[in-house]
């Protein structure tokens, strides 16, 4: 049976209409691509170097495109997480997270451990703790969680004692200071540069690495034990998103033997993988 001209025209109209409908559909490919993208907030370039390897592993093993967003301080990454400008962040200790999460009314959730970095006391002018002069200046971070940690380190090193009844102590809570050290409080990211005008400084490891401080020449190293388990670093997500499969896959991509290997290559003894660490 032959096909009439009318049938040909009708078939053409239907085909064109079908194409038009298809063209107006959402781009499923790009939508799927967006769903496989995770933006992770970091602080400092030293962490970025390790996450570049994690990024490759996540792409290879899970098809995830990790975007890295760098911050220069410890305040903005949690705000960015709450504001939804990033999906995860990986920069803070458990103790710092607990303090910040109260400020953000419980909107943050820990989704996995990363590493622990024993912080150290550094000096450009002295080789041992005993060399620190009476009345000398020691720099510590000024945000509550990191200042408490710095005071713990100074106390463990035998330089001061402070009132442990205070939940978030500052230099004002020091109760014993036999060498009359002047404790100077500065922003965490300024502690390393403050060494130029101070006798010593307690510097967070990521900032110490960024400043190219020699960790092997530190005057004192914070002990890694159960008492300091709150200083393990974590990956955080927004509350309500923590069970997303893709976020769990990012954590899995981080917590691998490959990451341990790269961590050792990049940082030596400065960082210790913490997801399977056994503290005594």
Question: For the regions a protein language model found, what residue spans apply to each?
Answer:
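A conserved helix-loop-strand patch within extracytoplasmic ligand-binding domains
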Residues: 111-160, 260
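Short, well-ordered beta-strand elements
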Residues: 34-45, 64-70, 137-138
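Ligand-binding "clamshell"
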Residues: 99-111, 125-126, 202, 210-223
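Periplasmic-binding protein-like
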Residues: 146-155, 253-275
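Short, polar/charged alpha-helical segment
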Residues: 44-67, 76, 80
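Short helices/loops that flank or line small-molecule/ion binding pockets
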Residues: 57, 75-87, 152-153, 172-203, ...
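Sec-dependent N-terminal signal peptides of Gram-positive bacterial secreted proteins and lipoproteins
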Residues: 1-28
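A bilobed periplasmic-binding-protein/Venus flytrap-type ligand-binding module shared by bacterial periplasmic
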Residues: 118-129, 231-244
């Amino acid at each position: 049976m032959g096909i009439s001209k009318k049938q040909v025209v009708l078939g053409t109209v239907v085909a064109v209409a079908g194409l038009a409908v298809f063209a107006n559909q959402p781009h499923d490919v790009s939508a799927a691509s967006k769903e496989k993208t995770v933006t992770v907030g970091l602080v400092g370039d030293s962490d970025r170097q390790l996450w570049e390897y994690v990024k490759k592993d996540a792409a290879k093993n899970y098809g995830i495109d990790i975007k890295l967003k760098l911050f220069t301080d410890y305040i903005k990454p949690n705000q960015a997480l709450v504001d939804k400008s990033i999906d995860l962040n990986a920069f803070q200790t458990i103790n710092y997270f607990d303090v910040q999460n109260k400020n953000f009314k419980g909107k943050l959730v820990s989704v996995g451990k990363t590493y622990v970095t024993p912080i150290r006391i550094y000096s450009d002018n002295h080789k041992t703790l005993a060399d620190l002069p009476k009345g000398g200046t020691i720099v510590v971070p000024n945000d509550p969680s990191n200042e408490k940690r710095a005071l713990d380190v100074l106390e463990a090193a035998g330089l001061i004692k402070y009132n442990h009844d205070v939940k978030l102590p500052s230099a004002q809570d020091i109760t014993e200071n036999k060498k009359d050290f002047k404790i100077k409080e500065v922003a965490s990211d300024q502690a390393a540069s403050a060494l130029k005008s101070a006798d010593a400084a307690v510097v967070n490891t990521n900032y110490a690495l960024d400043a190219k401080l020699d960790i092997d020449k530190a005057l004192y190293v914070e002990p890694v034990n159960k008492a300091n388990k709150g200083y393990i670093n974590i990956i955080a997500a927004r509350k309500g998103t923590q069970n997303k499969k893709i976020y769990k896959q990012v954590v899995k991509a981080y917590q691998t033997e490959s990451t341990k290997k790269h961590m050792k290559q990049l940082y030596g003894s400065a960082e210790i993988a913490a997801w399977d660490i056994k503290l005594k």
